[in-house]
């Protein structure tokens, strides 16, 4: 199982040196990947039940940040977890991600999802209601653009006639993982995905996903059933889960062991919301996590 770190978007601050040091520390400590969250705009909370991020939460632009981290590191995988794809222009995302993959020497993993913030969609001029249908077509367009010098694609949301990227990415195609915990998402992953990023998904700013009977084990089994129905091998997709640094060493170990038993391939530690005041504290936190799990299951 591969261990990674969640980039502490909301707490790292704006010092480029601190951002570079965090990524380089993660690489030096032997972590496999850095997972970066995405939001373009934060919204003012809508009432006391709001559970999502707000305008007060800092988010570095994810693709620009990964370009910076590509130059600051040499080995560690760079992953979005997740990029809210339907609120972005597909061809532009294809170009940006291809460039990151080139600059990093083939180290990009693209995690995508539909998101929950309708305010963000409206501000970016995209349809919140159409996001589920759109993302499936976007996946097809991305893979066409990443693998062919010239593409002709005419769909519901895209029209490309004899056009393509130059240069193409190192990975052809770049791996596409998906976030989310609904049944629709699981079926989409089974048909189209390279991996599944679990944990912390919001159904809306007001209500988290209800507890699934059987927990993660039941969800993984459901995904495997959908993979079989789609004609794919049960272990055709990677499985990534997150664990909170604030949960403590005993919980880290228990989570890693449980996830390994379920066939999990990736586990990332999130250091946000643990009372860490400085970027250096986040580096110390991932060092402690790595020492607690020197040989992951």
Predicted regions: what they are:
Residues 1-297:
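Active-site-adjacent structural elements that line small-molecule/cofactor binding pockets in enzymes
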